[in-house]
């Protein structure tokens, strides 16, 4: 497997830290040892996050093609679009963001705070569109690309989550390689990796990266899309494409893709009671914040798996914290009392 042959434009600080979640582990019985890899602390560009790691492999193509405008899409509180806006500002490029109404939730300030507020401050052309949630290609995004061309610009198309893109899985192949280096320093290997999944390329990259040492099925995706069949198909397809691209040397099978569907409800972007309990518990045990859309759901999943005895005693579990905390501001009413 060879990731080095792909050009990478550095947007992150370097390897992200691995932090023991000692108090949370003890609170949950002390039989499973929890750690977090802090992708939420990976960059100085508008709080960074998992999409910033992915964008490192897209930006060389942007520059090689002479593009002047990054065009991306997400929900109103999209972390993806905030990270694309930050990278565009960093590179001196224009940015057009399509922000669709993906979440069936209303808050007095939902479209004026958090991620979308930061994108506006970063100078992006933010376009609100009423269309609902989907993880496929969108007409509104195609129209935004065409509008840039019509104005004489040269757009570069970045799909939701950087996912359905030929290079979208590479960043998290690199994540797995980085974990292996850190495991050598720590003197032990992680038995499981827990990660949130929606558009698919984060888990897909991990599956490929950890397949290199036989741990593909130890990557446990926690679905937050509430459309698990679509998410599972996308993870599998992107993983297969990425495996071929990096020369993994074997096919990715359905058995390699583990996606837990229990924690996504009631629907995308809406937290359930377990999500909210997990957000508060992690915050109060570790001082680590998670969000109601993504990381709160994957944290809920990991906590419940520990409580249910689904990890063997003595297991070391690595929680991939992908970022997303700015979205908390969009849910101010839910958290009005903390």
From Swiss-Prot:
Q: Which InterPro entries match?
A: ACCD_DCysDesulf (IPR027278), ACP_carboxylate_deaminase (IPR005965), ACP_carboxylate_deaminase_bac (IPR020601), TrpB-like_PALP (IPR001926), TrpB-like_PALP_sf (IPR036052)
Q: Which UniProt keywords apply?
A: Hydrolase, Pyridoxal phosphate
One Gene Ontology MF term:
1-aminocyclopropane-1-carboxylate deaminase activity
- The entry's active site is 78
Q: Name positions with the PTM N6-(pyridoxal phosphate)lysine.
A: 51
Its domain of life reads Bacteria
Example GO biological process? 1-aminocyclopropane-1-carboxylate metabolic process
What's its top-level EC category? hydrolase
Pfam families on file? PALP
The reply on keyword Protease is: no
Q: What EC number(s) does the entry state?
A: 3.5.99.7
What cofactors are annotated for this protein? pyridoxal 5'-phosphate
Catalytic reaction annotation? 1-aminocyclopropane-1-carboxylate + H2O = 2-oxobutanoate + NH4(+)
Q: Which family does it belong to?
A: Belongs to the ACC deaminase/D-cysteine desulfhydrase family.
| Subunit structure, as described in the record | Homotrimer.
Function comment: Catalyzes a cyclopropane ring-opening reaction, the irreversible conversion of 1-aminocyclopropane-1-carboxylate (ACC) to ammonia and alpha-ketobutyrate. Allows growth on ACC as a nitrogen source.
Q: What is this protein called?
A: 1-aminocyclopropane-1-carboxylate deaminase
Q: Which organism is it from?
A: Paraburkholderia xenovorans (strain LB400)
Give the source lineage, highest ranks first. Answer: Bacteria, Pseudomonadati, Pseudomonadota, Betaproteobacteria, Burkholderiales
Annotated gene? acdS
